[in-house]
Amino acid sequence: MAYRSDRDREGSAGFINHMPAFSMTHTYALPALYPYATQIADGEWAFQGEFAYNFKRKTPMGGRYGTTLKLNATYIHSLQKDYIDGFGDKEALKGTEGYKSPFFGFGDETYYTDVNLTLDKKITKKWSLTAMYMYQLYNQKVVEGHGINGDIVHSHILVGDVKYAPTRNVSMRAELQYLYTKQAEGQWVYGLYELSLFRSLMLYVSDMYNIDATKTHYYSGGVSYNWRSHRLQVAYGRTRAGYNCSGGVCRYVPASRGVTLSYNVIF
């Protein structure tokens, strides 16, 4: 059930209630490039499961500090709709009007699929590694209302995340990500470097580059400072146009470039 401030509003605008997507929330940039939004008006079947295994220490896979392997899978599909005579044009119907659906009825469209395998390993006391492979099927036509080079985006994504902490007060982290697809805007690559000092000051630089369609750099750099429950951040960068999902709420964000200043406090 969807409640809007205006019955005629479409897309992701005007919602009064909110239903978060039943899919994994990704924190890495490229796995989160095509975020899924719950299809409240059309309805959906959604399934998600996760399996994790910890390799013990002093084993070939576990090594000295142990290794964690996680497999997460999400599958979201349309509902079967048996239309009732007398309700007019099917395309003009809204919400749950004009059709019946059996409880375990599946339609013809897949909305979203996400299968990802993540490896977390502490190599030494100072070095740790996270590696991930992800396959994603994203129905751009359903979620965004349009498709680029096809309605369905099939993506293969690789992520490498290395952390190095030489002392208690200094730590560094680097990310390298790659997304391959023949749909939408094609291939992407992303890099990030973070430097944390005294557990309160952090500096970062990042760049997300589109290899195929626009050949554009979306760079960003900034500094943040944490003190007790306060956090202040200043950043400069370029943001691509597209859907931005935060806390499960997705909204369209226009392209921008400039300085951002943010302040957060926890009560």
Question: Which residue stretches match the model-derived regions?
Answer:
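Exposed, low-structure sequence patches enriched in small/polar residues
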Residues: M1-F267
